[in-house]
């Protein structure tokens, strides 16, 4: 198993990923979520970091945001749809939505022209709008966002080559552009907390597990670039300054009981209120006061031939732009969890856990749990053979693609603000 931001190889063991990457199982927070998305209920979203911040903000009706992006290296497909659905759901749950088109990454890492990245990027934008993204979303191309590029420059001062080499495996042959893209992506994630967008707030980033190195680096950078750090102490919070003890003097007028030391200040009271007050002062004196971003991790969408669905492997995916009949044909050729013969399938039953078609049902095509459970039971009991199952899925894919593409055609971009 090899999982990096640019390559996924081998059989993925998600429980092992949770352990290796230091995530938390999403099942632990699922009971706290009102009306969870089917991707949450059905286990497509398997891990998280600090999603409790988002749940608390939802429950208290406090500001929060959802942010994710798409590298326009090929046509949008069902793997991208998973992230799009998560963004749309979080927006409907009260989050401010930020959608990045990672044209700088596509240009520097994949070698696409700026013209091609824009052409493809607009297809991603129309697709997520067709899936329900509302007009109040912030949509932008990385190369055209001064907020992102300026913040990336600031963040790049906080990281060096040795660290990038350890995280990403960069070497002397790695281009400077590819290295700088890591700062751009960190800025994508953190810029919803800039003052121009309402200041510090919880932000959740729905991603695949291959993007976790970006999240770990970004969480570290959020702490490094902020002036104040927080540590729990009995009855309150210990506040330190990363930029010099003189900054602590700006906290002297806070209306909490406190003890002032040479290198830190202990402030007593409810931790959340203290941290909010300190962050407010940090912004007032010119700091960033970033809250470490939260993240959710979804399973990789299995390609039609096995392995990860990838824009760089056209044979592996159903594009959201495929002609409906073509999409249906691809389903009929997809890898399934069936047995070698129909007789063996009737006797032993199918294996939906290994089936690309059942995955399409679970994560994209069937909303009804009762209907999905019936298909699974009939498959396992050998009563539903792969040929019939594929035909059912092919019709659903054809219907979805037809409706989705009609919605894309009807998208009125004049109702949206697109930076770029």
From Swiss-Prot:
Subcellular location: Cytoplasm
One Pfam family per UniProt: tRNA-synt_1b
Main location: cytoplasm
UniProt EC number: 6.1.1.2
Protein source organism: Archaeoglobus fulgidus (strain ATCC 49558 / DSM 4304 / JCM 9628 / NBRC 100126 / VC-16)
Name listed for the protein in its UniProt record: Tryptophan--tRNA ligase
GO cellular component, as recorded: cytoplasm
Primary enzyme class: ligase
